[in-house]
UniProtKB/Swiss-Prot annotation:
This is Glutathione S-transferase F3. It catalyses: RX + glutathione = an S-substituted glutathione + a halide anion + H(+). InterPro entries: Glutathione-S-Trfase_C-like, Glutathione-S-Trfase_C_sf, Glutathione_S-Trfase, Glutathione_S-Trfase_N, GST_C, GST_Phi_C, Thioredoxin-like_sf. One of its GO terms (cellular component) is cytosol. The keyword Transferase applies. The gene is GSTF3. Residues 93-212 form the GST C-terminal domain. GO terms for molecular function: glutathione transferase activity. PANTHER family: GLUTATHIONE S-TRANSFERASE F3, GLUTATHIONE S-TRANSFERASE RHO. Glutathione binds at S12, T13, H41, K42, Q54, V55, E67, S68. Pfam families: GST_C, GST_N. Keywords: Cytoplasm, Detoxification, Transferase.
Length: 212
């Protein structure tokens, strides 16, 4: 049976989300480069792996998956006893699992849409020869500040967003934060003491640094 393959781009935050999970699990894998600038993700053979034309796609033997957060959850469960545990300390505890699931949903629907717009404006536009729209940055930073206020309150109660242990909830934030730390938006993280500590810890994990 073939090993693990990730079809994506190393600069993609969604691809990085999966790569960090694999590194946390100390799993061997092959990264199959998909060139986004050439539109390879919108053509065959990639579309046969993800009909929506978005990276990454994933294979583990005969299993084929797409959507990065679904992939990381598969990795966390399939390889639960290998490497870092990415699930709640008691993965059979329904309440703990539900809290982690809330965090995953909050990241996907409250944090990431705003943070990704800021990364696009301040990082990725430059790669395409486009100018940053400062009005958009100001608008999105105001939204992100509100999300981070919620995080600050949560992190005053717990070490991590889903409790006292590092889980997928925290991991899913890492790739876009890595980009935003190199922009003026960094101030939104550093001016909140607990958020700042949390960001420093999760971005300095060995698995996180391997995708830079």
């Amino acid at each position: 049976m073939a090993g693990i393959k990730v079809f994506g781009h190393p600069a993609s935050t969604s691809t990085r989300r999966v790569l960090i999970a694999l590194h946390e699990k100390n799993l061997d894998f092959e990264l199959v480069h998909v060139e986004l600038k050439d539109g390879e993700h919108k053509k065959e053979p990639f579309l046969s792996r993800n009909p929506f034309g978005q990276v990454p796609a994933f294979e583990d033997g005969d299993l084929k998956l797409f959507e990065s957060r679904a992939i990381t959850q598969y990795i966390a469960h399939r390889y639960e006893n290998q490497g870092t545990n990415l699930l709640p300390a008691d993965s059979k505890n329904i309440a703990q699992y539900a809290i982690m699931s809330i965090g995953i949903q909050v990241e996907a629907h409250q944090f990431d849409p705003v943070a990704s717009k800021l990364a696009w404006e301040q990082v990725f536009k430059f790669n395409y020869g486009l100018n940053t729209d400062q009005a958009v940055v100001a608008e999105e930073e105001a939204k992100l500040a509100k999300v981070l206020d919620v995080y600050e309150a949560r992190l005053k109660e717990f070490k991590y967003l889903a409790g006292e242990t590092f889980t997928l909830t925290d991991l899913h934030h890492i790739p876009v934060i890595q980009y935003l730390l190199g922009t003026p938006t960094k101030k939104l993280f550093t001016e909140r003491p607990r958020v700042n500590e949390w960001v420093a810890e999760i971005t300095k994990r060995p698995a996180s640094e391997k995708v830079l």
